[in-house]
Amino acid sequence: MLCLSLVAGWSVTAAEPAATPAFPADVRVERAVAYLPTNRVERADLYFPLATSPAARLPAVVIIHGGGWNDGKRDAKREISTGSTLARNGYVAMSIDYKLAWGKYVVWPTNLWDCKTAVRWLRKNADRLGIDPNRIGVLGESAGGHLAAMVALTTPTDGLDPVEPDGDISCGVNCCVDMYGIADVAAFEQHPSMLPKTAAEAPELYRAAAPLTYVRSNSPPFLILHGTADKLVSIDQSRRLVAALEKAGVEHEFIPVPDAPHSFDLQPVQRDLRPVVLGFLDKHLRHLPANK
C-alpha cells in the first residue's frame, strides 16, 4: 500500500518495496553488515572469493556509490557488478551505504566519516575477514569518487578523521580508483546537496570539502576514469585533479573514456575497464608484501 508522508516540507510518496538484489553465484556475499555505531541504519555488503579462508590475507577495497550525495545504495546493479568483479579476482570488497543528504539536512562531513569508518572497520576485523590490514584501497563513482578521493588524500592532521569509533585505527588507504568524481565542489555546476550554503557564501567550507585541497607529494597512487561525453560532471574536474597530482609528483593514471557519458561501470560499451582497474589494484595492493 502507498502512503504519503511530509518531511521538512517535502511531500514524498513511498515506493513499493524494492526487489531483493540479485547476486552472482560465483562469489560469496555477506549482506547488510553493521559497520557503523548501533544508532545508525546504514549497512555494508561484503564480497569474497568462493575459495578463501581467514588465513588468506587478501587485499580489500571499499566501494563508495554515487548519487549526488543524496541518493544511491550499496547494492545497486553497478555496485554488485564491481564488488563481484573484485571478488572473482582475489579481493575482498566492501560496498557501503553512508549518510545521505535529505532536504536541508547537512550531511557533511558525516558522509566522509562513514567512508573512513569503513576503512577502520576492515582493519579492525581483518583476522575474521581474512584480509591484510596493510593492503586496503578505495573505489568510488561520481559523488562516491569525490568521497573516495577525500578518503585517500586527507590525513589526521586535516581534522577530517572521525574521532569515534575506533579512533586509534588508521583511515589511510594504499590507493584510490576515482571514477568521474568531483575534485572541486565549488566549480561543480550542480549545487552540492551535502553542503548547507553556496560556494559564494562559504568558500572555506567548499575548499575544505574539495580533494584538490589535499594533494601532497606523499598522497597514494590514483587511477582516474572519466567519460569524454560526461554532461553532469565535466571531465575538466578530473583533468584538474590530474594536474594537481602531477605537480605534486604523485603516481597516477588517467584514462579518458571516449564518448562515455556519466555514470558507467567497469564495463561501459566504449571500453572494458576491468583490465585497467584490476591491473592498477594488483600493482598497488596485491603485489605488496602481505602482512604476517
Q: How should each PLM-predicted stretch be described?
A:
Residues 19-28, 157, 165, 181-214, ...:
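Mobile cap/lid helix-loop segments that gate and shape the active-site cleft of serine hydrolases
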Residues 35, 73-80, 94-133, 267-272:
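Catalytic nucleophile-loop/oxyanion-hole region of alpha/beta-hydrolase
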Residues 224-226, 230:
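Short beta-strand/loop motif that positions the catalytic acidic residue
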Residues 16-55:
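N-terminal cap/lid segment of alpha/beta-hydrolase-fold proteins
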Residues 231-240:
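Conserved alpha/beta-hydrolase "acid-adjacent" motif
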Residues 53-58, 66-106, 146, 186:
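Short substrate-entry loop that stabilizes the transition state in hydrolases
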Residues 117-190:
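Primarily recognizes the serine-hydrolase "nucleophile elbow" in alpha/beta-hydrolase
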Residues 246-263:
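Catalytic histidine neighborhood in serine/cysteine hydrolases
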